[in-house]
Curated annotation (Swiss-Prot):
The gene is pth. Keywords: Cytoplasm, Hydrolase, RNA-binding, tRNA-binding. It comes from Vibrio campbellii (strain ATCC BAA-1116). TRNA binds at Y18, F69, N71, N117. PROSITE patterns: PEPT_TRNA_HYDROL_1, PEPT_TRNA_HYDROL_2. CDD domains: PTH (cd00462). The lineage of its organism: Bacteria, Pseudomonadati, Pseudomonadota, Gammaproteobacteria, Vibrionales. GO terms for biological process: protein quality control for misfolded or incompletely synthesized proteins; rescue of stalled ribosome. The keyword tRNA-binding applies. Its EC number is 3.1.1.29. The active site is at H23. Monomer. This is Peptidyl-tRNA hydrolase.
Length: 196
């Protein structure tokens, strides 16, 4: 990996009513990473989000969960990245992914937004730069595009939530590998994982 990751973002909608909805799966990864490292995320109004800072394998990693609504996520990411002079290719955005099943997660470098409003705004606010990393947390698909909005804003049943949590936990372990050993090794581990 040529660039180290300096910022991990978990996309979410703000407020307790959204906390356990599928659309907030990206934020669960950041929350779990903060918990593992015993760091409390603090509200930082100038960055429009909850922020923290940890060390992973001797490397500084900033954490961010935007407190804007999902479709304005890029505002928070761009504000923090500009302040700390973090380039798009040093950012990883964790987000829910309709095209992957619950219990599955994958790393990806670059690409489009795939209809995800949080990614769409992030690309836009980073000057149409798509070169950031993504951590895609599978939530499954409701089967028809007209059902997507209600599905992502809904809460998963208990068994499905266990799969989502397991994928988020494994993602946290694989982030350590990514930072220490690079993308391909982390992909080899994460992409063969499937919670049952």
């Amino acid at each position: 990996m040529t660039q180290p990751i300096k910022l991990l973002v978990g996309l979410a909608n703000p407020g307790p009513e959204y906390a356990k909805t599928r659309h907030n799966a990206g934020a669960w990864v950041v929350e779990e990473l903060a918990r593992v490292h015993n760091v409390t995320l603090k509200n930082e109004p100038k960055f429009f989000g909850l922020t923290g800072r940890i060390m992973v394998n001797g490397q500084d990693l900033r954490l961010l969960i935007p407190t804007t609504f999902m479709n304005l996520s890029g505002k928070a990411i761009a504000a923090l990245a500009k302040f700390y002079q973090i380039k798009p290719e040093e950012i990883m955005v964790a987000h829910d992914e309709l095209d992957l099943l619950p219990g599955v997660a994958k790393f990806k470098k670059g690409g489009g937004h795939g209809g995800h409003n949080g990614l769409r705004d992030t690309i836009s606010k980073l000057g149409n730069n798509k070169d950031f990393y993504r951590l895609r947390i599978g939530i499954g698909h409701p089967g028809h595009k007209d059902k997507v909005a209600g599905f992502v804003l809904g809460k998963a049943p208990a068994k499905e939530q266990e799969l989502l949590d397991a994928a988020a936990d494994e993602s946290v372990r694989c982030l350590d590998i990514l930072i220490k050993d690079g993308l391909s090794k982390a992909q080899n581990r994460l992409h063969t994982f499937k919670a049952e």
